Amino acid sequence: MSTTDAAIPQPNPHATAEQVEAALKDSKLAQVLYHDWEAETYDDKWSISYDKRCVDYARDLFDATVPAEEQRRLPYEHALELGCGSGFFLLNLIQAGVARRGSVTDLSPGMVKVAIRNGESLGLDVDGRVADAEGIPYDDDTFDLVVGHAVLHHIPDVEKSLREVVRVLKPGGRFVFAGEPTTIGNGYARNLSTLTWRVATNATRLPGLGGWRRPQAELDESSRAAALEAVVDLHTFDPADLERMAHSAGAVEVSTQTTEFTAAMLGWPLRTIEAMVPPGKLGFGWAKFGFTSWMTLSWIDDNLWRRAVPKSWYYNVMITGVKPS
């Protein structure tokens, strides 16, 4: 059963032009507006589910980061997700047997509400609250595990947030953050996404292809949200620099892993096309093609390219560390 620790403010899923303008000068306001806007469609946008596919994916990320001897001692009793979004990482890790119960936090009220709703639908023991990652509203030594997926690059002061993570962990507790963009990977992903958007936009203006384009009102709203994306995406990371930050925050047993090289080169163009095409237009065949192709390239990246490609060239970096006992 899921509960909230405190009343969650009302989300604002449709920011006005004036609010967007104000958010361009305030990164935390931008985080709230952007992620409130995305909250109700976030799972569809990123093909997130809470079935075996994503349960296995989340567990694979965890297992790739955490030492095998610690995996044999699972589950953790109480886990926190920082920047929970729709709850993808923690809810699927709980289902995978990593933790018994969880707390979800996000700066966006909309995301917290969706994450709690998802937890309720799964029958999981999850509570949640709106929270700033630079000032986590929990007591010292509260959690056995802290996790996050694609959150650190949104936080203005990453090292300050990691210090907060170490503070709320129990002695010997572990953190695992996955899905963070590397500096090199982010560069090629952004360029591929921009090129795909331009080509696809021009193609849907051709005779007979207008039905493959979302209504202009939706695209205009997407443009307002996209204007905030440059404000909310604050950092990219070199794996070695991220490790140094975690050490400076007081963590020990720090290590990083990277994932997705050619898989990211395919995944970003596919996601860009999905963002501009009306929902349901591409069909199951497209989804199956995208997932199967991405899985194949991910295997190649992990088992072949890793022997020759530098760690920092991969798109995603994951980091783990432990609070000293």
Give residue ranges: language-model regions.
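C-terminal helical/coil "lid" or tail adjacent to the Rossmann-like core of SAM-dependent
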Residues: 262-303
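Conserved S-adenosyl-L-methionine
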Residues: 251-262
